[in-house]
Regions:
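Non-heme Fe(II) oxygenase catalytic core, chiefly the N-lobe of the double-stranded beta-helix
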Residues: 109, 113-166
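Short catalytic-site patches enriched in acidic/histidine residues
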Residues: 102-121, 141-142, 185-192, 251-255, ...
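Short acidic (Asp/Glu) patches
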Residues: 61-68, 87-89, 97-98, 112-123, ...
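Residue-level recognition of short, solvent-exposed, well-ordered loop/turn junctions
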Residues: 74, 81, 128-130, 241, ...
């Protein structure tokens, strides 16, 4: 089961994609269950309600071909990001691997659909890509007792691109990275939200391409701090609400390494995470 939101920006409708007995996938309208895929929906055990309706045959089919897909979670109250969570990415950035998670934030209005047009910010010369595993919180998480308990607060997972402007992030930052992370549309999410029970978050292949040429190719098994640890750790410092998104870091292979040019108008970035779907952004100048 994969949850999606489709339609024009700000007017997305909920749907669910499921495998039929004949081995083919079909999309079903989820509006009999919920108006949207929100934190409130997740907190009310919405994933279980969606599965019950799907299994009962209560959902009409819907055609998604030709439809714009939005981010599969609406209006997260927070986007919490983990920096340098892959040792080789830390090395290519000129940093030692962290001994505790490095945390920064992106503003919620950076969220975009997986294939929406993306923009090089004004005055940018170093716009970069970052394929990342996104974690969507399903239950309020505060002062959790263990990583094992933290696992029960995760609704599901999605593909994310933590777009970044490196001059804004580093030279202009004053030590805080968010300046380089919060340009409009800098958090494409999706295409799907896959329930946590269907995902082995510790062994997923992540890849990215620019203009069809490979850039990143790694696995979440290489994360320094795994997902359950991160959710538990973060809960000791802040309260995560249902629908909030954690971006868990990116592997090596970004332009910051010096091995590849930064993005420019006309470039095409594609990212993919095993089982969670593929994104495609065409870049224009803001």
């Amino acid at each position: 089961m994969k949850l999606v939101r489709y339609g024009a920006p700000g007017a997305e409708k909920p749907a669910v994609i499921a495998m039929n007995g004949d081995g083919t996938e079909h999309a079903y309208d989820l509006s009999p269950v919920t108006d949207d895929i929100t934190g409130e929906f997740l907190a009310a055990d919405g994933l279980a309600a969606a599965k019950r309706a799907l299994d009962a045959g209560d959902l009409p089919t819907v055609e998604l071909d030709g439809q714009r897909l939005g981010a599969p979670i609406a209006r997260p109250s927070a986007i919490i990001c983990v920096g340098m969570n892959y040792a080789e990415h830390a090395a290519e950035s000129g940093s030692a691997p962290p001994t505790v998670p490095i945390i920064f934030f992106k503003t919620p209005n950076t969220v975009a659909g997986p294939d929406d047009e993306a923009f090089i910010p004004r005055n940018s010369t170093k716009t970069d890509w970052e394929v990342e595993l996104g974690v969507v919180i399903g239950k309020r998480a505060s002062y959790l007792e263990s990583p094992e308990q933290a696992a029960g607060h995760i609704a599901g997972y999605l593909t994310a691109n933590d777009l970044s402007e490196r001059t804004f992030q580093i030279e202009d930052s004053g030590g805080q990275w968010s300046k380089g992370k919060c340009a409009p549309g800098f958090s494409p999410l999706g295409p799907w939200l896959v329930p946590a029970e269907n995902v082995d978050a510790n062994n997923l292949r992540l890849r990215s391409w620019v203009n069809g040429e490979p850039r990143q190719d790694s696995t979440t098994a290489d994360m320094i701090f795994p997902v359950d640890f991160l959710v538990h750790h973060l809960s000791q410092y802040l309260t995560m609400e249902p629908g909030d998104v954690i971006l868990t870091g990116t592997p090596q292979g970004v332009a910051l390494s010096g091995k590849y040019p930064y993005l420019k108008a006309g470039d095409i970035v594609e990212i993919e995470i095993e089982g969670l779907g593929r994104q495609r952004q065409a870049f224009a100048q803001a």
